[in-house]
């Protein structure tokens, strides 16, 4: 039996391959280090729902937190209050609504809404994707996570909200950045995974498989204008999300997957 048209428009592997090739490029380490999601996406372009939820995350006692503490507080709250589920592929506002209602949310959904919470809390942030090559079908494919800039450590650090983890090297007090992670993995040096939660939540084995065992190729997602994407995803919601993304790519308004070039 032939597959329905909707499958070909949303899940056909060839469409993913074409899109991946169109948006992928190699970029210098300095350009990747300098990129920041906040440069494109400003506070006043983030929907009011994020500010409303932000008031639930932070109380008056949180006012004096540093950027690392704020970033951790947001990540813990989201993980504790969103059970996750199927991928959403909606505008950031609709995605947040659905996630809060227990209607889904995968790693890319967590990364997207986390980026917006970072913006409204003056935390510099990036969204990363990762192409994973593995014989394990639960690992092979893709994954999303974030990076935040911590003035406390004077560096970017990886944070995976969906998995609720930081990554470390020998110094267990300072998380590593994505570029450090790539270098350490290439050199086959020690990388440790630790829970964001102070209570030491059990780390899912899938996190070890994704970050330590698979052949991973991280890329930073750039040129993502959240306000513009939200507008088109809402206005063209009768189209499959892959078609909406494809339209924006073809008119030169799409995002890029930028792979570090050493």
Model-predicted segments: where are they?
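Charged, often glycine-rich, active-site loop that binds/positions anionic groups
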Residues: 96-104, 140-147
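Alpha-helical transition-metal enzyme core signature, strongest for iron centers
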Residues: 78, 107, 111-114
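Secondary-structure boundary elements
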Residues: 17-102
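Hydrophobic/aromatic-rich core segments of domains that either
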Residues: 112-189
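Intrinsically disordered, low-structural-confidence terminal and linker regions
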Residues: 1-18
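Short His-Asn-centered micro-motif
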Residues: 103-107, 128-130
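Alpha-helical and coiled-coil interaction segments, frequently adjacent to or embedded
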Residues: 176-262
């Amino acid at each position: 039996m032939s597959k329905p048209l909707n499958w070909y428009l949303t899940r056909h592997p060839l469409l993913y391959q074409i899109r991946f090739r169109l948006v992928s490029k190699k970029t210098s380490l300095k350009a990747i280090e300098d990129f920041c999601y906040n440069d494109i996406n400003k506070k006043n372009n983030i929907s009011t729902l994020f500010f409303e939820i932000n008031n639930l995350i932070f109380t008056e006692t949180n006012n004096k937190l540093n950027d690392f503490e704020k970033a951790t507080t947001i990540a813990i709250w989201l993980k504790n209050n969103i059970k996750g589920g199927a991928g959403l592929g909606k505008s950031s506002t609709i995605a947040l609504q659905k996630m809060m209602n227990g209607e889904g949310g995968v790693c890319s959904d967590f990364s997207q809404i986390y980026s917006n919470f970072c913006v409204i809390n003056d935390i510099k942030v990036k969204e990363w994707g990762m192409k994973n090559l593995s014989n394990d079908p639960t690992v092979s494919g893709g994954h999303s996570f974030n990076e935040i800039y911590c003035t406390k450590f004077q560096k970017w650090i990886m944070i995976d909200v969906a998995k609720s983890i930081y990554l470390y090297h020998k110094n267990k007090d300072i998380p590593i950045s994505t570029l450090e992670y790539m270098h350490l993995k290439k050199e086959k040096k020690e990388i440790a995974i630790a829970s964001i939660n102070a209570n030491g939540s059990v780390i899912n084995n899938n996190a070890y498989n994704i970050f330590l065992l698979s052949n991973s190729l991280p890329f930073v997602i750039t040129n993502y204008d959240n306000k513009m994407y939200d507008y088109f995803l809402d206005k063209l919601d009768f189209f499959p999300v892959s078609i909406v993304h494809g339209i924006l790519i073809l008119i030169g308004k799409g995002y890029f997957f930028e792979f570090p070039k050493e």
